[in-house]
Amino acid sequence: MDKLTDLNYTLSVITLMNSTLHKILEDPGMAYFPYIASVLTVLFTLHKASIPTMKIALKTSRCSYKVIKYCIVTIFNTLLKLAGYKEQITTKDEIEKQMDRVVREMRRQLEMIDKLTTREIEQVELLRRIYDRLTVQKTDEIDMSKEINQKNVRTLDEWENGKNPYEPSEVTASL
């Protein structure tokens, strides 16, 4: 932790990098300077970021092995990305998490398929019942009097006194 705030230590690392870069620049045949400079920059950044982070993590965490493993895997993945690789290093924990997630998703989809299958079977059964009712019902003896509302219609002979009750009677009004 004391090296985190030590300005002289940081300046000495920067001076070491600058002197290394100047020695590389003195060689006129050096065509890969930008690549070497970027690698040195990445290494310096990793050095400054990972060592204090690992020290703090080891002091505060209970399981130091997992922290070290995670930090090393992260550093290697960063280097692989900088090198242009799309693959990454994964730990067993990450693989197990991904497998659990895949298994959970498969279970959820199987439950959904089961529900949909049950619903489809119920719908097919309902359609079969409707079809059976439509085919069993006889159509030659349907009482249409209910449909046209003529159940209580009387003929002229059936009316009392032979008089149509719906004919208007004469009404006289005084003016």
Swiss-Prot record:
InterPro entries found in the cross-reference section: Rotavirus_NSP4
Membrane topology (Cytoplasmic) = 52-175
Q: Where can this protein be found?
A: Host rough endoplasmic reticulum membrane; Host membrane, Host caveola; Secreted
Q: Which domain of life is it from?
A: Viruses
Q: What keywords would UniProt list here? A: Activation of host autophagy by virus, Calcium, Enterotoxin, Glycoprotein, Host endoplasmic reticulum, Host membrane, Host-virus interaction, Ion channel, Ion transport, Membrane, Metal-binding, Secreted, Signal-anchor, Toxin, Transmembrane, Transmembrane helix, Transport, Viral ion channel, Virulence
| SUPFAM superfamilies listed in its UniProt record | Rotavirus nonstructural proteins
Q: Which residues lie on this side of the membrane: Lumenal?
A: 1-28
Name the Pfam families on file.
Rota_NSP4
After translation, the protein is modified as follows: The N-glycosyl content is primarily Man(9)GlcNAc, with a small amount of Man(8)GlcNAc.
Q: Does the keyword Iron-sulfur apply?
A: no
Keyword set includes Ubl conjugation: no
Glycosylation, residue list: 8, 18
To which protein family does this belong? Belongs to the rotavirus NSP4 family.
Q: Domain comment text?
A: Binds 1 calcium ion per tetramer.
Q: What does this protein do?
A: Plays an essential role in the virus replication cycle by acting as a viroporin. Creates a pore in the host endoplasmic reticulum and as a consequence releases Ca(2+) in the cytoplasm of infected cell. In turn, high levels of cytoplasmic calcium trigger membrane trafficking and transport of viral ER-associated proteins to viroplasms, sites of viral genome replication and immature particle assembly. The secreted form acts as an enterotoxin that causes phospholipase C-dependent elevation of the intracellular calcium concentration in host intestinal mucosa cells. Increased concentration of intracellular calcium disrupts the cytoskeleton and the tight junctions, raising the paracellular permeability. Potentiates chloride ion secretion through a calcium ion-dependent signaling pathway, inducing age-dependent diarrhea.
Q: What name has this protein been given in UniProt?
A: Non-structural glycoprotein 4
Report the source organism. Answer: Rotavirus A (isolate RVA/Human/Belgium/B4106/2000/G3P11[14])
